[in-house]
Curated annotation (Swiss-Prot):
Site for Transition state stabilizer, residues: C165
Pfam families: IF-2B (PF01008)
Record-linked InterPro entries: IF-2B-related, IF-M1Pi, IF_2B-like_C, Initiation_fac_2B_a/b/d, M1Pi_N, NagB/RpiA_transferase-like
Ligand binding (substrate): R58, G59, A60, R101, Q204, N255, K256
Active site as annotated: D245
Protein name: Methylthioribose-1-phosphate isomerase
Pathway: Amino-acid biosynthesis; L-methionine biosynthesis via salvage pathway; L-methionine from S-methyl-5-thio-alpha-D-ribose 1-phosphate: step 1/6
Organism for this UniProt entry: Xylella fastidiosa (strain Temecula1 / ATCC 700964)
UniProt record similarity statement: Belongs to the eIF-2B alpha/beta/delta subunits family. MtnA subfamily.
Annotated GO biological process: L-methionine salvage from methylthioadenosine
Keyword terms: Amino-acid biosynthesis, Isomerase, Methionine biosynthesis
UniProt gene name: mtnA
Disulfide bonds: none
Function: Catalyzes the interconversion of methylthioribose-1-phosphate (MTR-1-P) into methylthioribulose-1-phosphate (MTRu-1-P).
Enzyme Commission designation: 5.3.1.23
Length: 354
């Protein structure tokens, strides 16, 4: 398949949240954005596990990439004559990394890839692991640029778009998935208006996405999550563009909580709905969305904003982090392998196998 070349990503891609120094990992602390730009150093796999669990790093692709470097750091703590022995000794650390955020399939995919690489490695297994982690990050950036071009091509000139959560450079190796499509659409003059939902309770849209777009000089308008239906009714939005943490064999898609209601609202108003994610996010072993484990986080996250409590004491809260959008509500799934319009199990199988 021909891969169209997107515009120069250096114009609209200024943020890098993951920095490997050759000795340790530096992660942009996304809990403190937009007011504090601070990097956290990870010197061990346990540091990386904690960074994933506590949302220093977030976004399915970024979590996977960071887990790869976590495996590299774990390798610094053991001795082994070859990859097979190393794999046996590293398995507990790999399992801890996997347990840090269970919903995102990229995390499991990267760790499985590191296991395969190790099992074939010889005495140079440490170097092989580091090369593999570098390849994973490089491939993600290449895939994002490709997806940006594919997705932007679907958007008519002069369109308005709405996005949810953060799917840009902060959530990936760079450029972004859904936000990469928006960057490309802006560069091509296809997108005239960008709206961003605030994305409670962690406010990834309000804290991260509008800040990231601001770094690139892209104007964006923030809305309350509850304003999305009214916005769509006004006719200012032609596409909703979101990322994914897991895409099932039938096109059902797990993504940040609130995505499902956007898809329902978009269908009612005749607004198109696009999911953008790398092929690594596709899980052909999971038949449908009902089988996806939905992460539940501490209800305390819902009881305040930025550490300031806004709810009376003694109030219960329900805090699922993801929901599942049925494939039937999705107009297009965009990966680096191309576009699947009106996705179903047959089309998914034709593109991704199984």
């Amino acid at each position: 398949m021909h891969h169209p070349l997107p515009p120069d990503d250096t114009l609209y891609d200024q943020v890098r949240p993951i920095l490997w120094t050759g000795h340790f990992l530096k992660l942009l602390d996304q809990r403190k954005l937009p007011f504090v730009v601070e990097y956290v150093e990870c010197h061990s796999s346990e540091d990386v596990t904690q960074a994933i669990r506590t949302l220093i790093v977030r976004g399915a692709p970024a979590i996977g990439i960071v887990a790869g470097w976590g495996a590299v750091l774990a390798a610094r703590e053991i001795e082994a004559v070859d990859g097979i022995e190393a794999l046996c000794k590293l398995e507990p650390a790999l399992q801890r990394l996997h347990a840090a955020r269970p919903t995102a399939v990229n995390l499991a995919w990267v760790l499985a890839r590191m296991r395969r690489t190790l099992s074939a490695a010889h005495a140079d297994w440490r170097q092989v692991m580091e090369c593999e982690a570098e390849s994973i990050a490089r491939e993600d950036l290449t895939a994002n640029r490709c997806m940006g071009a594919y997705g932007a091509a679907l958007i008519p000139i002069g369109s308005g778009v709405l996005t949810h959560c953060n799917t840009g450079s902060l959530a990936t190796a760079g450029f972004g998935t859904a936000l990469g499509v928006i960057r490309d659409g802006i560069a091509q003059g296809r997108i005239a208006r960008v709206f961003v939902g605030e994305t409670r309770p962690w406010l990834q849209g309000a804290r991260l996405t509008v800040w990231e777009l601001q770094q690139d000089g892209i104007d964006a308008t923030l809305i309350a999550d509850s304003a999305a239906a009214h916005l769509m009714k006004s006719g200012q939005v032609q596409w909703v563009i979101v990322g994914a943490d897991r895409i099932c064999a039938n096109g059902d898609t797990a993504n940040k909580i609130g995505t499902y209601q956007l898809a329902i609202t978009a269908r009612h108003h005749g607004v198109k709905f696009m999911v953008v994610a790398s092929a690594a996010t596709v899980d052909m072993d999971t038949v449908a969305g009902e089988a996806i484990e939905i992460e539940q986080r501490d209800p305390e996250e819902l009881l305040g904003v930025s550490g300031v409590r806004t709810v009376a004491e003694g109030i219960a809260a329900w805090n699922p982090v993801f929901d599942v959008t049925p494939g039937a509500l999705i107009d297009a799934i965009v990966t680096e392998r191309g576009v699947i319009q009106s996705p179903d199990a047959a089309q998914m199988r034709a593109t991704f196998g199984n």
